[in-house]
Structure formats: C-alpha cells, structure tokens
Regions:
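Switch/coupling sub-region of P-loop NTPases
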Residues: 30, 37-49, 55, 59-175
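P-loop NTP-binding catalytic core
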Residues: 1-39
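Short, well-ordered beta-strand core segments
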Residues: 179-181
Length: 181
C-alpha cells in the first residue's frame, strides 16, 4: 500500500540551555559542546531516525554563531531543508537530481568557508567532508545514523570507503574532534 513521509521543519531552534532545562543534557555536557565549538573541533552527531540529531545540530549552529566571529562564513549543505542558521554570513546549498553532496562539498571549497555543515552524511561525500575539514576548514558539524558513538565513527569510515578508497581511520582520528550520541 502507498506510504509517504512528511517532514516538518522546526518552527524554532532550541538552544543548549533548553537541553539543560529539560534534563536532556547536563551542564557539563553543554560546556563540553561549547568548548568543542570554541576550539573549532569538528562535531559528529549520531543517533537513529527521529532521535533529534538535526535538532541538536541546529542548537550547535546557534551556539557557533553566538560564540564565533560575526565575519565567519557558514556553508550549509543538505538534501532536505532542515538546518537553521542565523549567521549573517551563510550560504545554504541543496542537492538536486544532478548535483549530489560530494559535488557540493567540492564546490564549497571555492566559497571560502569558515565552517562547513552537512545535514547528514549518507555516502561517499563523507570522504570529501573529512578532507575539507582537515585542510584548513575546521569547526564543522554533521550527522550520521548509528547506534552508538563508536559505531558512528565506523559508519563514517564505511561511508568514506564508498568513494573507492581504503579505510580512513587515521583521517577520521585526525579530523573528528567530538562525537555526540
């Protein structure tokens, strides 16, 4: 029988303080996230479908804008409009039937990005993102479907290998600064 999904974009961004107030996050966890953001570490958010990965990434984006320099240039890449960024200097690029995320990541390098954010990595674009983050563009964030933090790193490696390369564990270790599950 027919089936379809309706994705409803959030009407507001819940800041990290909301996570603390509702007991979803401790003060120490929020401070760890803030520290990672301030130190421009790349953040990988993992979880299952509907677990709140994108909602948390929007909170992280909000914190990046709050803690960062007004001149920071954010490039947001996604296939479905879900990310919300209040930065004055941001550009959102979307996939099309003819342009995939891997192509967008490569194009992003010509846009002088300070922070590269991908809504969700699902394929070979993982390798391009890791390379971009590791070549002068730290401080990004993305999501991946995984059952725990270790599985998230393994999944990122599997996705990078879809580009036809061997395991990228060393690159992942050098590039990903924090995994949130």
């Amino acid at each position: 029988s027919p089936c379809f999904a309706i994705l409803k974009r959030a009407t507001r961004v819940f800041p990290l303080s909301h996570y603390i107030e509702t007991g979803s996050m401790t003060v120490a966890q929020a401070e760890l996230l803030r520290s990672a953001i301030a130190e421009r570490r790349n953040i990988l958010v993992s979880g299952g479908t509907g677990s709140g990965k994108t909602t948390l990434v929007n909170a992280i984006l909000d914190e990046m804008v709050r803690l960062g320099e007004p001149s920071e240039r954010f490039i947001l890449l996604e296939d479905t409009v879900e990310l919300q960024c209040t930065a004055e200097n941001h550009t959102a690029l979307r996939t099309t039937r003819h342009v995939d995320l891997a192509t967008l990541v490569k194009a992003t390098m010509r846009l002088n990005p300070d922070r590269i954010i991908i809504g969700e990595v699902r394929g070979r674009e993982a390798l391009d993102l890791l390379k971009a983050w590791n070549t002068g563009h730290p401080g990004g964030c993305t999501t991946v479907h995984a059952n725990n933090a270790i599985a998230a790193l393994q999944r990122l490696d599997q996705l990078a290998q879809e580009a036809g390369v061997p395991s990228q564990r060393a690159l992942i270790a050098d590039t990903v600064g924090l995994v949130v599950h």
